[in-house]
């Protein structure tokens, strides 16, 4: 790995900007950012991104372009940092333009569009026959772009069944404030990434209704039980759920107003119609839908998932939602 290798970041939003800074601070000097928002790209050229971060925060000056072909020309690494609803269409365009061997790195969360596939699975499937793609690595774990930019100490994971690829990404990103661990359990990591967004919606709802830490602890622990049941069924490892991509990301996402999913839950209580207008950027909604539908064939007892689905997609009332969650049969904790 050479620190002058070209890195193409796809996206110019908050997380894309944070990843660009991390990579720069890790000694990488040849970074190109592709985006479609002219103002964001102009800002990034002069060391800021005012749409997402305070102008008091000074960033490196980056090469930017609205031309995907220029961004990808003779690149070595592609970092996908765009909303999941756009990722497949964008990736299929990328595959047509490649002219060099690349390692694809995804920091996008959620499911592959119009499928039950995780993003990692979808990217791997679509690039399987492409001669230029040498692998796909998912970078995931507890991290808000707003804190990464401020160089808050952050640890997440590089995940791939090919550990050498994961280790390569680990070295590419790690620096004095941003540290990657490697792991090979793609399934478990993706289950954690999906479930934590769903549970963050629930915790946001509870928070807005005035419930406190007792309730939050119940949501997280009972939600983790459902996450484990689902993870066991689809073949993930328990150890993964107990690590950064499971419990770690759950604590972050389900307890902070910086989380779009937590904020969606709060807004849902205040103004449901307005909240649902943000559906494209709330990854937990698609995750909820996919987990609920896939569980139709598994038949697992997932009361949080089923009740939350009925609340958001089948319009039961908040009071009915509470009754479904709370008034269940008394039984042993681990039944």
From Swiss-Prot:
According to its UniProt record, this protein's enzyme class is oxidoreductase
Q: Which organism is it from?
A: Mycoplasma mobile (strain ATCC 43663 / 163K / NCTC 11711) (Mesomycoplasma mobile)
Name the InterPro entries on file: 6-PGluconate_DH-like_C_sf, 6PGD_dom2, G3P_DH_NAD-dep, G3P_DH_NAD-dep_C, G3P_DH_NAD-dep_N, NAD(P)-bd_dom_sf
Question: Looking at the keywords, is Nucleotide-binding present?
Answer: yes
Q: Where does the record place it?
A: Cytoplasm
Q: What Pfam families does the database record attribute to this sequence? A: NAD_Gly3P_dh_C, NAD_Gly3P_dh_N
* The UniProt record lists the keyword Lipid metabolism: yes
Q: What is this protein called?
A: Glycerol-3-phosphate dehydrogenase [NAD(P)+]
